[in-house]
Each structure stands twice: as structure tokens, then as C-alpha cells.
UniProtKB/Swiss-Prot annotation:
Source species: Bacillus licheniformis (strain ATCC 14580 / DSM 13 / JCM 2505 / CCUG 7422 / NBRC 12200 / NCIMB 9375 / NCTC 10341 / NRRL NRS-1264 / Gibson 46)
Domain Sm: 8-68
Function: RNA chaperone that binds small regulatory RNA (sRNAs) and mRNAs to facilitate mRNA translational regulation in response to envelope stress, environmental stress and changes in metabolite concentrations. Also binds with high specificity to tRNAs.
Classification via Pfam families: Hfq
Protein name: RNA-binding protein Hfq
Oligomer status and interactors: Homohexamer.
Gene Ontology MF terms: RNA binding
Gene: hfq
GO cellular component: cytosol
Keyword set includes RNA-binding: yes
Length: 73
């Protein structure tokens, strides 16, 4: 049985669909933009033409503007 990585599926889907997302950081700061890439430790967000590399351990929540369809089976 294949292990499902929901985090990677979610991030990859919002990246592929260029979905706008609000990223809530643990310190309360909010970033709005699009996910351009990610790896095991970081997420690259682009907002207003500027890129920010955010460490995943600093992120609390991703809130996409629209629902994300995942294949969980």
C-alpha cells in the first residue's frame, strides 16, 4: 500500500493551479501570494513580483482562495 503525503499533494496542486493562498506564520504574520515551489523544509511564495523563501517550521496554516482537489486513494 502506497503512503499518501497530503502535504506534498496539497502544495503541488496549489502550485500547478497558481492558486492564491494566504500563509499564516507562527508569529501571526500573513503572506498572500502563489506557491512557486517547495521541498522538505521550505516553501517559495511569490507575491507582487517578489519571492520569499519560508521555512515550513515557521508556517501555521495555508488558506487557499478556492478548495483544493486531492486524490487520496
Amino acid at each position: 500500500m502506497k503512503s499518501i503525503n497530503i502535504q506534498d499533494q496539497f502544495l503541488n496542486q496549489i502550485r500547478k493551479e497558481n492558486t492564491f493562498v494566504t500563509v499564516f506564520l507562527l508569529n501571526g504574520f500573513q503572506l498572500r501570494g502563489q506557491v512557486k515551489g517547495f521541498d522538505n523544509f521550505t516553501v517559495l511564495i511569490e507575491s507582487e513580483g517578489k519571492q520569499q523563501l519560508i521555512y515550513k517550521h515557521a508556517i501555521s496554516t495555508f488558506a487557499p482562495q478556492k478548495n483544493v482537489q486531492l486524490e487520496l486513494e
